């Protein structure tokens, strides 16, 4: 057993894993297990750069180096324009990403980073699913509570955490700040696995395990994923859909509150013109209004979440137009330039 895991017990894999848990939306620092995420980001940056220098990792081609420089100077410009030091966090993370990419290139372009990420998401999805079944069976209770970043209570169950635990309803957030975050990053893991790693076991475990997030967005994104990759294999689509529905019904059948809380989220809400579980459309509309008011350079990342903006436009949480509202057209170009 030890012989199988010994190749992974080295600094490189520690660096990979630390990059997954160093900061928000992971909650380890909120539970007091790690320093504040800003400290973790600096530590991650120093460790990644030190590894690159000590191992003398090779350089990227000039176009890639130029892209990194444009982004770095672009965010410095935004920090000065908006008087916002949070843009320096982006620079640190950008340079850290650059360093980790160089490490992977030095390893012959291996997929070790992607594989490690996929396994980490599978662990959260499956352990959370097991934990939820134990909670619903009355065999598991919260070990302790902690305060989430938005000041709501979070619950640590040992196998998973969640910010949704009331009235018989419990959802798996893994070790992220909310179930939707686990579902969001889980979809990334699915796509990475399908396109590069191609591990069928990982794919099945992710698809089934992420059901425990009970995220409406997950099921919408999963439907798109299945149509893109399995549209020519109708029997697989039917089989996967059947497994998902049976698993869902099994989980939600434990109590009436959970059943209505989940299936009720797919009911049409006439007051909003969308399904009851849609909690992003309003946020997207607000951010789109802000973008229309500040189209070129945006409002600034920190300004966007200020009380003044909340009183004028309403609360703006994570959504597709958040970065557009914060950074405008110029910021969007800088962000998506590597694509």
Protein language model features and the residues they cover:
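A membrane-periplasm/extracellular boundary helix in multi-pass inner-membrane enzymes
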Residues: 80, 133-136, 230-271
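Interfacial loop-to-transmembrane-helix boundary motif in multi-pass membrane proteins
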Residues: 12-14, 66-71, 101-149
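Hydrophobic, aromatic-rich transmembrane alpha-helices
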Residues: 1-4, 43-58, 186-195, 331-339
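Long extracytoplasmic/lumenal interhelical loops at the membrane interface
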Residues: 27-33, 256-330
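Hydrophobic transmembrane alpha-helices and their immediate junctions
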Residues: 63-66, 197-200, 223-231, 235-239, ...
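Alpha-helical transmembrane segments of multi-pass inner-membrane proteins
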Residues: 118-144, 161-214, 218-231
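N-terminal signal-anchor transmembrane segment
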Residues: 1-57, 72-81
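Interfacial juxtamembrane loops and adjacent helix segments
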Residues: 138-171, 303-320, 325
């Amino acid at each position: 057993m030890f012989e199988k895991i010994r190749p992974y017990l080295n600094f490189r894999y520690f660096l990979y894993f630390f990059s997954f848990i160093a900061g928000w939306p992971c909650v380890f620092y909120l539970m007091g297990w790690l320093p504040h995420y800003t400290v973790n980001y600096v530590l991650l940056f120093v460790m990644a750069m030190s590894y690159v220098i000590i191992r003398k990792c090779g350089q990227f081609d000039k176009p890639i180096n130029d892209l990194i420089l444009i982004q770095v100077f672009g965010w410095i410009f935004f920090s000065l324009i908006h008087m916002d030091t949070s843009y320096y966090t982006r620079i640190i993370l950008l340079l850290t990403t650059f360093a980790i990419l160089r490490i992977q290139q030095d390893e012959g372009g291996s997929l070790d980073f992607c594989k490690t990420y996929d396994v980490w998401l599978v662990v959260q999805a499956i352990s959370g699913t097991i934990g939820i079944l134990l909670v619903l069976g009355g065999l598991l209770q919260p070990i302790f509570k902690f305060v989430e970043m938005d000041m709501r209570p979070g619950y640590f169950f040992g196998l998973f955490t969640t910010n949704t635990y009331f009235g018989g309803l419990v959802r798996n957030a893994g070790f992220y700040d909310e179930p939707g975050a686990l579902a969001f990053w889980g979809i990334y893991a699915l796509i990475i696995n399908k396109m590069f790693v191609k591990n069928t076991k990982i794919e099945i475990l992710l698809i089934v395990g992420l059901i425990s997030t009970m995220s409406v967005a997950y099921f919408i994104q999963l439907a798109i994923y299945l149509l893109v990759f399995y549209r020519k294999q109708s029997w697989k689509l039917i089989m996967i859909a059947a497994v998902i529905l049976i698993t869902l019904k099994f989980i939600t059948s434990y109590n009436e509150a959970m059943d209505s809380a989940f299936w009720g989220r797919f009911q049409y809400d006439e007051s909003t013109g969308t399904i009851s579980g849609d909690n992003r459309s309003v946020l997207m509309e607000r951010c789109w209004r802000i973008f229309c008011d500040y189209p070129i350079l945006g409002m600034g990342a920190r300004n966007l979440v200020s009380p003044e903006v909340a009183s004028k436009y309403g609360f703006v949480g994570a959504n597709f137009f958040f970065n557009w509202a914060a950074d405008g057209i110029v910021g969007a170009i800088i962000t998506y330039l590597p694509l």
